[in-house]
């Protein structure tokens, strides 16, 4: 390495070290996301090609693996897929997507149910259980969602899910007020809820690779902390690398 490098070379070296620092903290992400996170945290603006150059020189690659979880469902009531209608989502609480994802920590099985606003990818409600097949994660998460919905009583809302047995059950759907319209993915077609499927994969990668969930602390606390990070500090490609909170504050009426 040069003992007295030119300013541009010195800047490149410094930025390579900066990307290495962020990669150590967030190993599940690639250069575009790391660049956006650096911009968000440090106010340092770099082009994506330049960020790619820094990461390539540092040997940085995303270590994330995509997880897939397919659960059987015995549907009781099937609703049409309203997401297939190519509707325009242009406000908060217009369309909420929900799904359950599962993972293991220190030999204990956990199920996490999420309710996400498709407008800005904000997780509005979540519920965690270490009991396999616990229907209350769905119910508790739904109750949290409906509490937030009370802040905007004027809005109609679509709730989209797969055809899992809880989502299709009479007990679940009887909890829904009149202003909530149900929508469901077609059977065996996870791409109908691709946004939620993608988020589930990233969440599990980030929980273990970036947040290092080990069970040394209560898993509920670690999940709550991650959800806050997801909503407030994690830039999203689909939001032009704003966080869900930033997007809501910038565009919500």
Regions found by a protein language model. Give the residues of each.
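An active-site-proximal beta-strand-loop segment
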Residues: 85, 89-124, 128-132
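Basic, flexible linker segments flanking DNA-binding modules
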Residues: 1-91, 189, 243-251
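Active-site beta-loop-alpha junctions of metal-dependent nucleic acid enzymes
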Residues: 127-152
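Cysteine/selenocysteine-centered motifs that mediate thiol-based redox chemistry or coordinate metal-sulfur cofactors
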Residues: 150-168
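C-terminal domain-tail junction helix/linker
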Residues: 173, 177, 202-253
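RNase H-like two-metal-ion nuclease catalytic core shared by retroviral integrases
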Residues: 72-74, 161-163, 169-170, 184-204, ...
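Short small-residue beta-strand/loop micro-motif enriched in glycine and branched aliphatics
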Residues: 122-126, 182-185, 208-210
